[in-house]
Amino acid sequence: AIYSQLGQDVGVSVEPCRRDTFPAIVLSVAYLKDVLGVAEDEPIVICPVDPYVETAYFQALQALCDRAGESGANLVLMGIEPTYPSEKYGYIIPETADDLSRVTMFREKPTKEAAEEYIAKGALWNGGVFAFRLGYVLKRAHELIDFTAEDQL
């Protein structure tokens, strides 16, 4: 879907086998740094590629990328306004109701009752769209992954 919307010149990293989100991101970030020479202060956006989206989505991705580069935040998330209390999504609880806000709490796939409470507090669904500076994820990867242990690679 991404090539049909953006053309063949866009760079896409595909994980060689399923190892969950963080290892896939680390693989992509390592490729960007080691193969393409991307600087560690460069903002990177992570997003699902399966949905068909409108042009406004890409404008929002650019704003997210800009915010990651300018704000000094380690991670910038894009939330989705919930339409019902779901146990299938993570919830982002923002500090304020502004379009841009610090996150006070994040809860992954809560019970329906907890989701109702979060929505009442102005929570947003985590849509899996976020941005960060490349160096931040490299630093976290080296803190969390033992790159000398074969079973972790």
Regions found by a protein language model. Name each.
Residues 1-46, 52-59:
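Conserved N-terminal catalytic core of the sugar/cofactor nucleotidyltransferase
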Residues 18-23, 83-86, 112-113:
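A short acidic, often aromatic-flanked loop/helix-cap motif at beta-alpha or helix-coil junctions
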Residues 40, 56-59, 87-91, 142-143:
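Short acidic, glycine/serine/threonine-rich loops at helix termini
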Residues 45-48, 77-81, 107, 131:
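Short beta-strand segments
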Residues 52-87:
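Conserved donor-nucleotide/metal-binding helix-loop-beta segment in metal-dependent transferases, i.e.
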